[in-house]
UniProtKB/Swiss-Prot annotation:
This is tRNA-specific 2-thiouridylase MnmA. NCBIfam families: PRK00143.1, trmU. It catalyses: S-sulfanyl-L-cysteinyl-[protein] + uridine(34) in tRNA + AH2 + ATP = 2-thiouridine(34) in tRNA + L-cysteinyl-[protein] + A + AMP + diphosphate + H(+). Keywords: ATP-binding, Cytoplasm, Disulfide bond, Nucleotide-binding, RNA-binding, Transferase, tRNA processing, tRNA-binding. The active site is at residues 95, 194. The gene is mnmA.
Length: 358
């Protein structure tokens, strides 16, 4: 019996090749495109057209699933609230969990009677017989690896998901797109968040939802160096665009939403030897009850660094870095790795915890 699979199609080259590969391997493919953003002329419109074109070319059905309310509630509202509270949220991991994979699997199972889904993400999944857990791994192409954004997927979702591109490089993907003669073969990769593509910049997007609120830019002693029009325009570690003159380079060290202040200091002041992580999801291992030695990635393009991860109170972990790290940003994800294997991850806390660990 031919196995069926729902393939998430964004209209880009990666998801197009994922669908074409599975189709060539004998799967009965159903393309599904998520309608994410409200309003006409948004970024998703072109994607819908391109996804439909790919399905027509492959001779497979194409479905459109309306997830606009989910996207509004879980992404737009989440971003606006976070930036307003002085943190820098990571929308992509949140979107993968709450808007893309979960709803797509639910639609596949309940509306189509299909138990497998696939996407064009660069990551790998394997089943560990010893632990009886599905493990999330980095992609073969480390430059395109997207496991950082997928750490929050559940065991149920990993068990049902295929990543056809995980074992190949982006160069091979482009070659396959040409070989399949796909209509998206020459389409450029997206360089920004879909929100930025739709609104021009993150600043423009946030200004649409958050009213200007003037405040002070101060140094670590509290001396006023300048003024700002809203803390949502700033992020930890930021140097450019501060609008203040100083004898030495200054960086954003802290955002204080209570006092509506941007606190700046030298580069060393923007570094930290530890941070706390909440809203944890343990992927490839059960939740640890003792400290573990591993690597952590604290932003998408940063190199992994060695840490001690210590179980803490309130279902948090404390990360102690071997060397101080610059610009640890509350709201971003801290994803733990053992080599290529994603152990788990969570969201960096805005404040340090003071209670002793386990």
């Amino acid at each position: 019996m031919t196995q069926k699979v729902v393939v998430g199609l964004s209209g880009g080259v990666d998801s197009s090749v994922a669908a074409a590969l599975l189709h060539r391997q004998g799967y009965a493919v159903v393309g599904v495109t998520l309608w994410l953003m409200k309003g006409k002329g948004q970024c998703c419109s072109e994607g819908l057209v391109d996804a439909a074109s790919i399905c027509e070319q492959l001779g497979v059905p194409h479905e459109i699933v309306d997830t606009r309310d989910l996207f509004q509630n879980h992404i737009i509202d989440y971003l606006v609230q976070g930036y307003g509270e002085g943190v820098t949220p990571l929308p992509c991991s949140q979107c993968n969990k709450a808007v893309k994979f979960g709803p797509m699997l639910q639609y596949a199972q309940q509306s189509l009677g299909i138990d497998k889904i696939a996407t064009g993400h660069y990551a790998r999944i394997r089943f560990n017989e010893a632990s009886q857990r599905y493990e999330l791994l980095r992609a073969v192409d480390r430059q395109k690896d997207q496991s950082y954004f997928l750490y929050d997927l559940s065991q149920e979702i990993l068990a049902a998901t295929l990543f056809p591109l995980g074992e190949q490089t982006k160069t091979v993907t482009r070659q396959l797109a040409a070989e399949f003669d796909l209509s998206t073969a020459e389409k450029k990769d997206s360089q920004d968040l879909c929100l930025i593509e739709a609104h021009g910049s993150m600043r423009d997007f946030l200004d649409k939802y958050i009213a200007p609120k003037a405040g002070e830019i101060v140094d670590l002693s509290g001396a006023v160096l300048g003024h700002h029009e809203g803390i949502h325009h700033y992020t930890i570690g930021q140097r450019k665009g501060l609008g203040i003159a100083a004898a030495e380079p200054l960086y954003v060290v802290k955002l204080d939403p209570v006092m509506n202040r941007v606190i700046v200091g030298d580069r060393q002041s923007a570094g930290s030897g530890e941070c706390y992580v909440q809203r944890l999801n343990w992927v490839s291992i059960p939740e640890p009850t003792a400290p573990i030695r591993c690597e952590v990635q604290v932003r998408y393009r940063s190199a992994p660094v060695t840490v001690n991860a210590i179980p803490w109170h309130d279902q948090q972990i404390k990360l102690v870095f071997d060397e101080p790290q610059f610009g640890i940003t509350p709201g971003q994800a801290a994803v733990l790795y053992d080599g290529d294997r994603v152990l788990g991850g969570g969201i960096i806390c805005p404040q340090k915890s003071e209670t002793a660990g386990v």
